[in-house]
Amino acid sequence: MKRIVVIVLMMAACLGNAQAQLHLKANVQNNHLWRGMEVADGCLILTDLGYTFANGHMTLGLWGGTNTQGSYKEFNHYITLRTGGLEFSAMDTYNFSPGATYNNRQYFNYSAHETGRFLNCTLNYRFQQPRFPLLLSWSTIMFGRDRSADNKEQKYTTFVYAEYPIYNKEGWKVDAGVGGAFALNKAGEKQNFYGNTSGIVHTQLKVSHDLKIGSYTLPVHAMGLWNPQSQKAYFQIGAQIVNL
């Protein structure tokens, strides 16, 4: 892990002058939904601080979230590489909630058998044809709390996802998506990181709109999410309050 950090910092130093840019974004929403799960509820603030360089091809960033009750906290590190419609990202995720059954009290613990973290690697491709802007995504948990029941093997749970904008007119956009999960290494078990068995765990319909308030633009969204495997459904509404 230390070697990876050193390599990334060296790349940043070498490429940092090539059209480098800082950005800060923050959203307020009523819950945090991710891949068929409600990670946290209540009023949340989610933030993204990033440094983009190498002519826009690379971003290093910090992603964080908390709810107003203080029962949920998340602080992640990530790196993103992109070219054309292809994008690769790796996010080192660490989150805390009172009911967690994993180790969420040792931030710097990277022991495979003990850590509460997980490293999620994602490869996205967005078709560049204006008439067919389909998004395809493959994500695998490469390290961390995605283990077999006896804690001897990494399961490499994978989430595959497809999304398509079914409406995009007059400032309104509607995206429909569906995702399924399975373990590359089942380790003799049916369960994976996202559910009790392989299958569809995420279907969504998201409506986005840029709300004009005088000279200010407030991006807002509403989303319905259904998980047929867990028999659960969630509704989310949110707004982007910072975009620098």
Predicted regions and their residues:
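Residue-level signature of outer-membrane beta-barrel architecture
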Residues: 30, 51-53, 81-83, 92, ...
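Outer-membrane beta-barrel "beta-signal"
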Residues: 205, 231-244
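Outer-membrane pore/translocation modules
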Residues: 68-161, 190-198
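Short loop/turn motifs that connect adjacent beta-strands in outer-membrane beta-barrel proteins
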Residues: 19-21, 54-59, 89, 128-134, ...
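Cleavable N-terminal export/targeting peptides
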Residues: 1-23, 244
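Transmembrane beta-strand segments that form the barrel wall of outer-membrane beta-barrel proteins
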Residues: 26-32, 57-68, 88-95, 103-107, ...
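Outer membrane beta-barrel transmembrane domains
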Residues: 173-212, 221
